[in-house]
Amino acid sequence: MPAVQLLLLACPVWDVGARTAQLRKANDRSGRCQYTFSVASPNESSCPEQSQAMSVIHNLQKDSSTQRLDLEATKARLSSLESLLHHQLTLDRAAGPQETPEGLQRELGTLRRERDQLETQTRELETAYSNLLRDKSVLEEEKKRLRQENENLARRLESSSQEVARLRRGQCPQTRDTARDVPPGSREVSTWNLDTLAFQELKSELTEVPASRILKESPSGHLQSREGDNGCGELVWVGEPLTLRTAETITGKYGVWMRDPKPTYPYTRETTWRIDTVGTDVRQVFEYDLISQFMQGYPSKVHILPRPLESTGAVVYSGNLYFQGAESRTVIRYELNTETVKAQKEIPGAGYHGQFPYSWGGYTDIDLAVDESGLWVIYSTDEAKGAIVLSKLNPENLELEQTWETNIRKQSVANAFIICGTLYTVSSYSSADATVNFAYDTGTGISKTLTIPFKNRYKYSSMIDYNPLEKKLFAWDNLNMVTYDIKLSKM
């Protein structure tokens, strides 16, 4: 083996020493033919000693070991590359086959549909924004009008103050007239003591009141007094709206306000509640101890409901607020004095959150009402196919005591209320000259058409309720809280 290595070592210098290479052939001592190949060293002038040859052989062995280690390292790297390639192939198989053109087309179609939906939502948002801008413009005009009225009132107040000051600086004319001087028919004036210089300052306030609040027109066209309005009867007349309060912000565009027709301590027949219902988390209930506080906008208390309510169908009855829970068919009884939930009950099968609303929308699927006989709920179901369903509710546990199904389509009317067990509907929420157009008598189960004029003064009535204690309709018309006097025929 060393001789072979020496031969291999000598091969690279073949070109250098090719001119001095010799090949000899001769017989050895035993007569066998031997070939001898000789090459001259290119560097060494004489042959090295045996120890030097062993050093060369050792170096060659070391180089061979190094090459062997390099070969092993190369094999290890190749093995690592094979493992990585196998792992990648395994991942590719787990990921499944590559997308086909059909799959890419389906994905493209899905993206296009999503784009169309986003464009539709964008248009809806732009429309809603335009409506808000229009409402803002209307509110700004109303604000200007109210500011002008406020300035006029301030001028009138200043003028009145100056007049009062002028009168106080003056003196009443002295007179010594007695009862003998008083003309016949005016004897009661003689009780005044006019002999002194003292005088009384009388203050008066002029309030504009529609004539319909004093006199009412009968079906025959004659005006009648309010005598005889007590007790039950059939609705025959609705008066002009009287505005008591205007909401301060756009959150009051829709809402509900009410007084308790059966007040319990500590509340009175003057206690008023108000809820602005624009928003997704409506929980605030404003309470006013006096009507004057309500009209001035100074609540005495604000209730925070434990659960948000839905739309404008709430009522107050016997010290409790009854309302529909948001996005549900559940009716809740909330005791106002203790601020606790006393009962809650689902209305079986009732549509909610836009299934069967009134024509103006607003998630008015479930509408609570109060009349002389107690608590009611107005709604519809899939079984009734959108027709109005009436149920009498137990005010304590909210159980349904009796139910009637009418032939009046709920989405074809703007609102409804109940008087003396009869359901009445209003034809339009936005027409200035609407009508009370249908009546359904729960006593007979008979419905009929009506044409009783009903004024939407502000052209967006979102709530109409009857108060049996005051014999009035309460309504919320486009930010404004109004009342209507009514006339019932005698039973």
From Swiss-Prot:
The record marks R213, I214 as: Cleavage. GO terms for cellular component: cilium; collagen-containing extracellular matrix; cytoplasmic vesicle; endoplasmic reticulum; extracellular exosome; Golgi apparatus; mitochondrial inner membrane; mitochondrial intermembrane space. InterPro entries: Olfac-like_dom (IPR003112), Olfactomedin-like_domain (IPR050605). The keyword Disulfide bond applies. Glycans are attached at N43. It is found in: Secreted; Golgi apparatus; Cytoplasmic vesicle; Secreted, Extracellular space. Residues 151-189 are annotated as: Disordered. It comes from the Eukaryota. GO terms for molecular function: metal ion binding. Residues 98-171 form a coiled coil. Residues 231-490 form the Olfactomedin-like domain. Palmitoylated. Its main location: secreted. Disulfide bonds join C232-C420. Keywords: Calcium, Cell projection, Cilium, Coiled coil, Cytoplasmic vesicle, Disulfide bond, Endoplasmic reticulum, Extracellular matrix, Glycoprotein, Golgi apparatus, Lipoprotein, Membrane, Metal-binding, Mitochondrion, Mitochondrion inner membrane, Mitochondrion outer membrane, Palmitate, Secreted, Signal. One of its GO terms (biological process) is bone development. Ca(2+) binds at D367, N415, A416, I464, D465. Secreted glycoprotein regulating the activation of different signaling pathways in adjacent cells to control different processes including cell adhesion, cell-matrix adhesion, cytoskeleton organization and cell migration. Promotes substrate adhesion, spreading and formation of focal contacts. Negatively regulates cell-matrix adhesion and stress fiber assembly through Rho protein signal transduction. Modulates the organization of actin cytoskeleton by stimulating the formation of stress fibers through interactions with components of Wnt signaling pathways. Homodimer (via N-terminus). Can also form higher oligomers. Interacts with OLFM3, FN1, NRCAM, GLDN and NFASC. Interacts (via N-terminus) with MYL2. Interacts with SFRP1, FRZB, FZD7, FZD10, FZD1 and WIF1; regulates Wnt signaling. Interacts with SNTA1; regulates muscle hypertrophy. Interacts with ERBB2 and ERBB3; activates ERBB2-ERBB3 signaling pathway. Interacts with SNCG; affects its secretion and its aggregation. This is Myocilin. The gene is MYOC.
